[in-house]
């Protein structure tokens, strides 16, 4: 999963205990939060012992009583014990994002936006190497001029 920063919010889907949820990727949130109106009624929850800061005033704050199995947007295995409160959309916090291997990368300014789009369409993920297992060279190979005119491509 990759998302360019744009006017659209970065949202992705996760499957928690077999149920699909969509949430906002929030690197500023320590913990993941599920909207109270999306929390299944038969899933146990308890009053949270700590409040939530940064989302306004939430009168009812709960936490899952269980640690739940979660599959990330690219089927990354993870676990979460989310907070639950009245918010308009779910938030995927760093508790999940770290397990999913999320990265924030800023492309090298030497590459044009067009070349970055071409690479992204070809399946390149910033910060990952090229190749089947994304384990290839992670930085571009720089072309160097061979002043001695020796080596492949130069007459002896």
Swiss-Prot record:
The keyword Hydrolase applies. Autoproteolytically processed at the N-terminus. Expected C-terminal autoprocessing not detected. The sequence shown is that of the processed Pro protein. PROSITE patterns: ASP_PROT_RETROV, ASP_PROTEASE, G_PATCH. It holds the Pfam family RVP. SMART domains: G_patch. It comes from the Eukaryota. GO terms for biological process: proteolysis; viral translational frameshifting. PANTHER family: GAG RETROVIRAL POLYPROTEIN (PTHR19422), RT1 CLASS I, LOCUS CE15 (PTHR19422:SF123). Two human-specific proviruses are inserted as tandem repeats with a shared LTR in most individuals tested. The telomeric copy is referred here as 'provirus 41574'. The centromeric copy is referred here as 'provirus 41575'. Belongs to the peptidase A2 family. HERV class-II K(HML-2) subfamily. Active as a homodimer. Retroviral proteases have roles in the processing of the primary translation products and the maturation of the viral particle. Endogenous Pro proteins may have kept, lost or modified their original function during evolution. This is Endogenous retrovirus group K member 6 Pro protein. It comes from Homo sapiens (Human).
